[in-house]
Amino acid sequence: MAERNEQLERLAYEYQLLQAQAQLLAQNLELLTLGRNEFQAVKQTLEELKKVEDEKPEILVPIGAGSFLKGMIVDKNSAIVSVGSGYATEKSLDDAIGYLDARIKEYDEAIRKTQEALAKLEGQLQELAQKAQKLQQEAAMRFSVKE
């Protein structure tokens, strides 16, 4: 009986650890998805800019709190893109779009790996729950047999 209780406690502890890991992975997955969506939105904006016929199109520049300033794109043939660690570089629109595509693919791969790891953890959680349920059923059967 004491051994069964120890097994149940050990299973509960393992379950809590795996559940915490799964929660961290789910949060990471959410952050990765947000990052990917941001890169996708920038890419789409640059693709749409290529279609604009005006040489210096007018735009709205967000300044926060839902407020904007009217502005003008001085050079619609290039964009300044972040390359990480606080650095940015000027690229042609096509090069910028290519760079963004590569980053989106990196995000897609990280998302895929995170989803796989999360699915594996969920499978392990399910196995632990089944083991615990089996132990509890065995204990209940022994208890009812003794009565």
Curated annotation (Swiss-Prot):
Keyword Chaperone in record: yes
Keyword Chaperone attached: yes
Annotated localization: Cytoplasm
InterPro entries noted in UniProt: PFD_alpha_archaea, Prefoldin, Prefoldin_subunit_alpha
One record GO biological process: protein folding
Family designation: Belongs to the prefoldin alpha subunit family.
Function recorded in the entry: Molecular chaperone capable of stabilizing a range of proteins. Seems to fulfill an ATP-independent, HSP70-like function in archaeal de novo protein folding.
Name of the protein in its database record: Prefoldin subunit alpha
Organism: Thermococcus onnurineus (strain NA1)
